[in-house]
Curated annotation (Swiss-Prot):
Biased composition (Low complexity): 784-794
Lineage start: Eukaryota, Metazoa, Chordata, Craniata, Vertebrata
Stretches the record annotates as Disordered: 650-723, 765-815, 837-872, 953-993
Residues modified to N-acetylalanine: 2
ZnF (AN1-type) residues: 889-938
Protein name (record): DNA-binding protein SMUBP-2
Bias kind Polar residues: ranges: 667-683, 703-716, 837-847
Catalytic activity: ATP + H2O = ADP + phosphate + H(+)
Binding residues for Zn(2+): 911, 914, 928, 930
GO molecular function: 5'-3' DNA helicase activity; 5'-3' RNA helicase activity; ATP binding; ATP hydrolysis activity; ATP-dependent activity, acting on DNA; ATP-dependent activity, acting on RNA; double-stranded DNA helicase activity; G-rich single-stranded DNA binding
Subcellular location: Nucleus; Cytoplasm; Cell projection, Axon
Gene name as annotated: Ighmbp2
Source species of the chain: Mus musculus
CDD domains per UniProt: DEXXQc_SMUBP2, R3H_Smubp-2_like, SF1_C_Upf1
Length: 993
């Protein structure tokens, strides 16, 4: 062993750990000194206003207390937080700063948190159900001390079973050639070829083997098989992982195989299903359990006698007896522990739980033959050295393409602390020590292909059983547009759904994306997908809180977490909200590629990504994700979900050719495969953009595509000139004929209908979309002289603004475009089409008549009877552009109220809800028709900030009954004290007289 190599490695690791420790301590100190309790809660390290919901005695006399948020509604959930099972927490009274007790968090759900307190707290801890408490995550000194001790042991390690392994792991020597092993008889007969090869490889290696398991490839199944085969060969196995959850997962799997297993660790940190395998539980069932209990009872009795006697000689005798009893107790307990450890085939613990200051110190140094470290890529390298020093061979399993070890210090992470042992060894030794699992059993082919190409060099494939499965294949789920696509991109670019810019907060939120998530989940649930099969993943705690406020009451089974909370998990459908939407193009820690990989690969059948492509495309990796979804999935704009959004490029300025924001290069329309083509397998979408995968090269199960627009002139955004020319030729034939109406089939996609709308406007024809869902179709007809839906081409000179027609009524949407000029109907046309569809539906409901063409005719007749005031321009052709500009300027400087023509140049206000200007007498939202939107906005703001503003209503001052009763008791107690003081003073006066 090269001592210089070991010393330099240990020195570097100790320095990095010191940086991490200092950063953690400084962070905690800064939080407590400069952050309010509410800010601590927003950071996820504190839970406020908790009430005791239940108390019970847990395993081995521990006191388990369950806390819940104070209930002000039917269903209250905990705010988004970073608490996990096993964390050390401090308990505080809400009205005091002193710490009441320290406990271990055993379980946390969306509605409650359970903490285990030791027996020592039973006498001092008196929790009142009517009081409120808070929990604060505390720094764990034990872990840091154990990591430091392991590195110092490595530095002093000269001879022992792990000497050769240490040289290989630190690069002083190379791994030995693999051994020849006989053919294996596998316990699990369903293993695929790559899994069997990985098992054989791990057993044949003499010192080091690495099992690389991408998402869904059955890594844990392979690790369990390796452990079983090692036990079959008579080897003693120490199995570790960085987290309690990962260890318990292995315990559950091994317990099914009827092997003798022993789980080390605090019982409060273990899952209830594995607690009977813990060391404490095994000791309680051992032969020495009764003897140990008798010795403890004798010690208690001698203590009692010692307190009662006053004789010094007797006290001395009692102390000597207690000393002897304690010595016997220690010997008996150690003998029982050694017996339990040696009787086990597999000993399991966390990396730090395998330290030498625990039960393993009772075993010989060379007791274990092999160490298995699962989820090694998530562990700090220093923590892996705790178990690695106990055996001559190690098997590492994990995926260094997923989440790295969690660190606080950015400086330490950049210096190498976030680089795992597995990642370092895989890069150094390559295929000589690594075997990759290549068949995944989780994801649809389209989902898998992106992860395979982006992160794993295209090396793993889908098993046929999952390659084509979709949500619609689940029992009770109907075939809808949402359940038949594996990939869905909902693009918010140009829709004005910007992220929240919270001051003094590092967290981000996006209420617009929350609304989109809510609508998409409702569509999935309506189709029959169970809420428990859906996961919503957000990168920021603030967004998680907003999502829970919107969804948890209606869908309590729905899981809403950050990316870190879903590592190793899977769901049938996953919705990703990227949150970031800003004009600077900042993506924050979305730039961490491995986090995105984890988020996408949690899904089995359906992934929906909600993002602003204009923002996220500033990061190369995210751009590849958007491009892949665009090419192989379905792309929709946010306007297909939200009717009341005014896009950023849909402004008065934009109509003058001076858009306030650059035109997004993301797709703005949804391109879907019609139902008839879905059944026949025919493709109706446009050809892909140059440089992308062609339709024939698409993976199985991939869906239709939409292309980015590289032009800004509103041309066809999906390529597809053949389809456009086909529609143009059809309309030209109709114009040349004597027919009055042309109907297009229902098989047209929404984007095809958009093309027809554009062409109809260009030819000056009337165009209406009627019907719902698959029955929706578009009808093109000739304009009647009285029709004023949009301006037809006019050979004569354009009319002046003074001669323009009166503005149509607000409830009669009118598409105003420039004839024979480049039209930009993208999002605006789609929005107007949706409005027309809604009004048509309302007219059918009111009159009980089919929509068809009756609505435009009645609108025209109604307009003849009563023409409201308000100038509107008939847009001229490009020959007289000055008239167009003057008309638009005049309209922009006139009150937008339907019966008002007062100028707003001097006295006017802009409405944030409808993006129009109004005179002062009409600017209130309740007057011009935005009352509901204003109230909704106020409610949302109050809910988010927790502050009542002037005009937002009166605060409910009614006290909670429990709180009122508590205050009443305090008042009665105080009055009693004052009354007794008055009585005593009165008696003193009487005595004085």
């Amino acid at each position: 062993m090269a001592s210089s190599t070991v010393e330099s490695f240990v020195a570097q690791q100790l320095q990095l750990l010191e940086l991490e420790r200092d950063a953690e301590v400084e962070e905690r100190r800064s939080w407590q000194e400069h952050s309010s309790l509410r800010e601590l809660q927003s950071r996820g390290v504190c839970l406020l206003k908790l009430q005791v919901s239940s108390q019970r005695t847990g395993l081995y006399g521990q006191r388990l207390v369950t806390f819940e948020p104070r209930k002000f509604g039917p269903a209250v959930v905990l705010p988004s937080n970073s608490f996990t099972s096993g964390d050390i927490v401090g308990l505080y009274d809400t009205n005091e700063n002193s710490q009441l007790a320290t406990g271990v968090l055993t379980r946390i759900t969306q509605k409650s948190v359970t903490v285990a307190f030791d027996e020592s707290h039973d006498l001092q801890l008196n929790l009142d159900r009517e009081n409120t408490y808070r929990l604060l995550k505390l720094a764990n000194d034990v872990t840091y001390k154990r990591l430091k001790k392991a590195l110092m042991t490595l530095k002093k390690y000269h001879s022992g079973p792990a000497s050769s392994l240490i040289d290989i792991l630190l690069g002083s020597s190379t791994p030995s050639p693999a051994m020849e092993i006989p053919p294996l008889s596998f316990y699990n007969t369903t293993l695929d070829l790559s899994q069997k090869e990985a098992v054989s490889f791990a057993l044949a290696q003499k010192e080091l083997a690495i099992i690389h398991g991408p998402p869904g490839t059955g890594k844990t199944t392979t690790v369990v098989e390796i452990i079983l085969q090692a036990v079959k060969q008579g080897l003693k196995v120490l199995c570790c992982a960085p987290s309690n959850i990962a260890v318990d997962n292995l315990v559950e799997r091994l317990a099914l195989c009827k092997k003798r297993i022993l789980r080390l660790g605090h019982p409060a940190r273990l899952l209830e299903s594995v607690q009977h395998h813990s060391l404490d539980a095994v000791l309680a069932r051992s032969d020495n359990a009764q003897i140990v209990a008798d010795i403890r009872r004798d010690i208690d009795q001698v203590f009692g006698k010692n307190k009662k006697t006053q004789d010094k000689r007797e006290k001395g005798n009692f102390r000597s007896e207690i000393k002897l009893l304690r010595k016997e107790l220690k010997e008996r307990e150690e003998a029982a522990i050694v017996q339990s450890l040696t009787a086990a085939d597999v000993v399991l613990a966390t990396n730090t739980g395998a330290s030498s200051d625990g039960p393993l110190k009772l075993l010989p140094e060379d007791y274990f033959d092999v160490v298995v470290v699962d989820e090694c890529a998530q562990a700090l390298e220093a923590s892996c050295w705790i178990p690695l020093l106990k055996a001559p061979k190690c098997i590492l399993a994990g995926d260094h393409r997923q989440l790295p070890p969690t660190t606080v210090s950015h400086r330490a992470a950049l210096a190498g602390l976030s680089r795992s042992l597995m990642e370092r060894l895989a890069e150094k030794h390559g295929a000589g020590v690594v075997r990759m699992l290549t068949v995944q059993y989780r994801m649809h082919q389209a989902i898998m292909c992106w992860a395979s190409e982006a992160m794993y060099h295209g090396q793993f494939t889908s098993h046929p059983s999952v390659a084509g499965h979709l949500l619609k294949d689940l029992p009770g789920v109907t075939d809808t547009e949402e359940t038949r696509v594996p990939l869905l991109l909902i693009d918010t670019a140009g829709c004005g759904l910007l992220e929240l810019e919270e001051e003094d907060s590092q967290s981000k939120g996006n209420p617009g994306e929350v609304r989109l998530v809510t609508l998409h989940i409702q569509a999935l649930v309506d189709a029959g997908v169970q809420a428990g099969d859906i996961a919503v993943i957000a990168p920021y705690n603030l967004q998680v809180d907003l999502l829970r406020q919107s969804l948890s009451n209606k869908h309590p089974e729905l899981e809403i977490k950050s990316v870190d909370g879903f590592q190793g998990r899977e769901k049938e459908a996953v919705l990703l909200t990227f949150v970031r939407s800003n004009r600077k193009g900042e993506v924050g820690f979305l730039a961490e590629d491995r986090r995105i990989n984890v988020a996408v690969t949690r899904a089995r059948r359906h992934v929906a990504v909600i993002c602003d492509s204009h923002t996220v495309n500033n990061h190369a990796f995210l751009e590849t994700l958007v491009d892949y979804f665009t090419e192989h999935g379905e792309v929709r704009t946010a306007f297909e979900y939200l009717d009341d959004i005014v896009p950023e490029n849909y402004t008065h300025e934009g109509s003058q050719g001076h858009s306030r924001v650059p035109k997004p290069k993301c797709p703005s329309t949804s391109i879907r495969k019609p139902a008839s083509d879905q059944e026949s397998g025919q493709e109706t979408r446009a050809a892909p953009r140059h440089g992308r995968r062609k339709p024939s090269e698409k993976p199985p199960g991939s869906h239709v595509q939409s292309q980015h627009s590289s032009s800004a002139n509103g041309s066809d955004r999906t390529g597809g000139p053949d389809r456009t020319e086909h529609f143009r030729a059809t309309i030209e034939e109709f114009v040349a004929s004597k027919e009055s109406q042309l109907e297009f089939p229902t098989s047209l996609s929404s984007h095809d209908r958009l093309r027809v709308h554009q062409l109809a406007e260009e030819f000056g024809l009337r165009h209406d979309s009627t019907g719902e869902g698959k029955a929706r179709h578009i009808t093109v007809s000739r304009r009647s002289p009285a029709s004023s839906g949009s301006v037809a081409p006019q050979p004569s000179s354009p009319p002046s603004p003074a001669q323009a027609e009166p503005e149509p009524r607000a409830e009669e949407p009118v598409t105003v475009v420039q004839a024979h000029c480049p039209v930009q109907l993208d999002l605006k046309a789609l929005h107007l089409e949706r409005l027309q569809r809604q009004q048509s539906s309302q007219a059918q409901t009111a009159k009980g008549q089919p929509g068809g063409d009756s609505r435009p005719q009645k609108a025209s007749q109604k307009k003849k009877k009563k023409e409201p005031k308000g100038p509107v321009m008939a847009l001229p052709c490009e020959e007289d552009f000055d008239a167009l500009v003057s008309a638009v300027v005049k309209a922009d400087n006139t009150c937008s109220f339907s019966k008002c023509s007062v100028s707003t140049t001097t006295l006017g206000q802009f409405c944030m809800h409808c993006s129009h200007r109004y005179y002062l007498s009409h600017h209130l939202p309740e007057i011009h028709g935005c009352g509901e939107k204003a109230r909704a906005h106020a409610r949302q703001r109050i809910s988010r900030e927790g502050v009542l503003y002037a005009g937002s209503g009166t605060k409910d001052r009614a006290l909670d009954p429990a709180k009122r009763a508590q205050l009443q008791r305090r008042l009665d107690k105080k009055l009693g004290e004052l009354s007794s003081q008055r009585t005593s003073r009165k008696k003193e006066k009487e005595r004085g007289t």
